[in-house]
């Protein structure tokens, strides 16, 4: 999550799992993208409509740019690998920059949106949008939401969540 009162006060948080530090890295790069976008807004337009963020789509594009275009690039992997090897020698000493780059760009279905690869991330967003439309149009009852969620994940990603935490409740 990234927020702040103005471009001079940008704060963000990240999650961290010692068993999977890449989730923290890419989450941090994502939130950095939000922060950099906020810090780049024209200060002379503060408190005016033209000085506000251009919308969630543009905001998200900037966070995804840092997470994926920068963070998943070969150049970044080659820069990062000595640092990973220094801090995680038992796991990373024999890994090259290209090996890291290939592994962080692997495309495969996943249950959790914020951990999804660049290709399937958009399917996670599409599924949420389709479910939202059904809810708003009265085509889906709240009580049926968990099953509808799992059905759409199976239809578009070929996977079902083993529990509600990794399924319909993951964004809470």
Regions found by a protein language model. Give the residues of each.
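Catalytic zinc-binding patch centered on the HExxH motif and its immediate surroundings
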Residues: 1-8
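An internal, amphipathic alpha-helical element
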Residues: 8-9, 170-172
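Short pre-active-site segment immediately N-terminal to the catalytic Zn-binding motif
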Residues: 13-27
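Active-site recognition of the HExxH zinc-binding catalytic motif
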Residues: 23-43, 60-64, 131
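Long, well-ordered alpha-helical segments
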Residues: 32-40, 68-82
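Active-site metal-coordination segments of metallo-dependent hydrolases
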Residues: 48-60, 120
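An active-site-proximal "capping" alpha-helix that borders the catalytic cofactor pocket
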Residues: 56-70
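Long, amphipathic alpha-helical stalk/connector segments used for oligomerization, subunit docking
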Residues: 72-171
């Amino acid at each position: 999550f990234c927020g702040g009162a103005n471009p001079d006060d940008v704060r963000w948080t990240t999650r961290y799992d010692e068993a999977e530090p890449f989730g923290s890295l890419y989450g941090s790069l994502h939130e950095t993208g939000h922060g950099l976008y906020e810090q780049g807004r024209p200060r002379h337009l503060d408190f005016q409509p033209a000085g506000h963020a251009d919308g969630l789509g543009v905001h998200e594009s900037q966070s995804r740019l840092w997470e994926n275009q920068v963070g998943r690039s070969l150049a970044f992997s080659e820069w990062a690998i000595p640092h990973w090897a220094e801090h995680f020698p038992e796991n990373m000493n024999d890994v090259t920059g290209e090996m890291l780059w290939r592994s962080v760009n692997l495309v495969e279905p996943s249950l959790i949106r914020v951990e999804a690869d660049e290709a399937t991330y958009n399917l996670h967003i599409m599924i949420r949008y389709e479910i939202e439309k059904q809810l708003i149009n009265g085509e889906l009852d709240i009580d049926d939401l968990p099953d509808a969620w799992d059905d759409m994940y199976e239809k578009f990603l070929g996977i079902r969540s083993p529990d509600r935490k990794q399924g319909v409740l993951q964004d809470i």
